[in-house]
Amino acid sequence: MTDPLIPAVLAFRANGTPFSPLYDDIYHSAVGGLEQAHYVFLRGNALPERWQERRVFTVVETGFGMGINFLVTWAAWRADSSRCERLHFVSTEKHPFTVDDLRKVYAATISDPEIAALAQALADAWPMLVPGTHRLEFEEGRVVLTLVFADAQDSVPALRLRADAFYLDGFAPARNPELWTSAIFKALARLAGEGATFATYSSAGDIKRALTQCGFEYRKVDGFGWKRAMLVGRFAPRWRVRRHEPPAPLVVDERHAVVIGTGLAGCAVIERLAARGWRVTSLERHAAVAQEASGNPAGVFHPMISRDDSVASRVTRTGFLYSLRHWAALERLGYGPSRGSKGLLQIAADDEEALSISQAIAAASYPSEYVTSVPADEAQRLAGMPLAHGGWFFPYGGWIDPASLCAAQCAAAGPLLERRFGVDVARIERAGGQWIVFDTAGQVVARAPVVIVASAHDAARIAGLQYAPTRSIRGQLTLLPAGTVRPPLELPVIGEGYAVPLANGATLTGATYELDDPDTSLRTDGHLENLARVAQMLPAFAGIVDRADPAALAGRVAFRCVTSDRMPMIGQLADETVAARDAQRLRGAWPLDLPRTDGLYGAFAYGSRGLVWAALGAELIASQLEGEPWPLERDLAEDIDPARFLLRALRQGTVS
């Protein structure tokens, strides 16, 4: 169970310095927060010199606080003509400020106009206060802030990245000892890249001993303001004792990737790679993008709520919030997909479920902008028609046209994307550091050092995977013409089924759930099933069921690709041949122990959650390729790792 997030309380000392009543300590020196950040952290880590001419540079901070260190680092990056191409700043925070308090503290403490403008941009992008990883992008994606709202004792060990510099900036060790433990420093040591440096305002003896024990060399230098001394140093272990090295970028002769499949999964990967300067060749067997499940007239998107905050809830929460930011960025570029803006209402199956989820929402202390419980009368007001029960409302949930999203992402990729349609991929082979892609006629259709298989049901076959238990689920939609639903539905309503009011006045309902059924034809009993399920949530639909001529109704059939655990397959694929050869040695393996196939990645089995998983999955794959910080916690990445089924088979001794 994830602990609820408790926001910071904004307070000021008599001299105007912001401080935390919880820790009874100040957020920065009374001499000046900007000056302290420059002196202690930039100068202490030899920045900006060390990031110059680098492609990617990653800073890891313990304790985001007001974000002053990030703002000063960002400003230094902007001012440096020799800056790195991409600056990552990763920070943890157990008690983040609300956006209103963040704006107040900036207004009260920042007078520098450049920093104030950056502070405004950060406040405008400030995420909802829910636990987990939040990735924010600035400067057209060249400055990336990854915030982890969680206790550092849990979040730092869950990071997966290669750090170039550490900002050790929690409250004083005497006030906040949990942030200065050997366990924290050991976790940081596992993240340190070659030549990684650190700086901290503290010079306490316990800190020096812990740093030394974890492989860091330190030296004492003059402190900032009234502090006599501070520590700076570097990661220089005497022995190589790490089981796994931090992630590194894939070394390729050319940054060129082939993406197989152009549904939600593939188009998201295309955009994320092109945003990093990769040339992409897309291969699609149909004549256009989004022709299978991604071609439905609309799809709904929302996070999951569960009493235990399950893995699925955590992944969908991260994916949902990342998707919202990603779509907003597309809209700012002029490539906005077609989507609704009134929110989404989820209806409980009965009063017991309504109470259970209401209690889960209250226990998690979720902000109302994320989700709120609504009784039946309030739910009815939101929906514009009577409802069977109350439920919960997602103000930023809703519907989106998947095909428009796919088109927007391809358009955003611009000239870096070469699109090829009518190509039915049969298999791939590795030779000479390149992947060679063959069609069903045996002809070579593409070559590249990287292939991302995003072709749903065909993905495991194309990639040659034996341990990828995917299945097909037939889903039939029913489309009610404009004027059928009276009064009209105001927003998407989901529960046992779903009903979505479309922009043209029609109402989309669905969907059936038929395992391993290949029939592509519309069925009258499927239409009746859809309408009957919706009528259980929305009694007004009962009359539609009675009046409907199912044979005359329009609809669509598509097929969802799912795994046995209903989680997606996202990330670098394992080398199953090597794993089989070393099966005995790998019987007690962990995900990072598994042999991986160079340059081969998967993005498939998204089921009915492609809208909340596709953008995050694409960002994860791009981050793995580039050796960048991952956009979600390592344990969650392992729960969607395509190699997880191979790992289970190895542990069970069934790989041969």
From Swiss-Prot:
Top-level division of the source organism's lineage: Bacteria
GO BP terms in the entry: methylation; tRNA wobble base modification
Gene Ontology CC, one term: cytoplasm
Region (tRNA (mnm(5)s(2)U34)-methyltransferase): 1-236
Gene3D superfamilies cross-referenced by the UniProt entry: D-Amino Acid Oxidase, subunit A, domain 2, FAD/NAD(P)-binding domain, Vaccinia Virus protein VP39
Cofactor: FAD
Record bears the keyword Transferase: yes
Xref: Pfam families: DAO, Methyltransf_30
Compartment(s) where it occurs, according to its Swiss-Prot or TrEMBL record: Cytoplasm
SUPFAM superfamilies in alphabetical order: FAD-linked reductases, C-terminal domain, FAD/NAD(P)-binding domain
Single GO MF descriptor: flavin adenine dinucleotide binding
Keyword entries, A-Z: Cytoplasm, FAD, Flavoprotein, Methyltransferase, Multifunctional enzyme, Oxidoreductase, S-adenosyl-L-methionine, Transferase, tRNA processing
UniProt EC number: 2.1.1.61, 1.5.-.-
Stretches the record annotates as FAD-dependent cmnm(5)s(2)U34 oxidoreductase: 260-656
Reaction(s) catalysed (UniProt annotation): 5-aminomethyl-2-thiouridine(34) in tRNA + S-adenosyl-L-methionine = 5-methylaminomethyl-2-thiouridine(34) in tRNA + S-adenosyl-L-homocysteine + H(+)
Broad class of where this protein is predominantly found: cytoplasm
Record's signal peptide: none
Family, per entry: In the N-terminal section; belongs to the methyltransferase superfamily. tRNA (mnm(5)s(2)U34)-methyltransferase family.
Protein purpose: Catalyzes the last two steps in the biosynthesis of 5-methylaminomethyl-2-thiouridine (mnm(5)s(2)U) at the wobble position (U34) in tRNA. Catalyzes the FAD-dependent demodification of cmnm(5)s(2)U34 to nm(5)s(2)U34, followed by the transfer of a methyl group from S-adenosyl-L-methionine to nm(5)s(2)U34, to form mnm(5)s(2)U34.
Protein name per UniProt: tRNA 5-methylaminomethyl-2-thiouridine biosynthesis bifunctional protein MnmC
Gene transcribed to yield this protein: mnmC
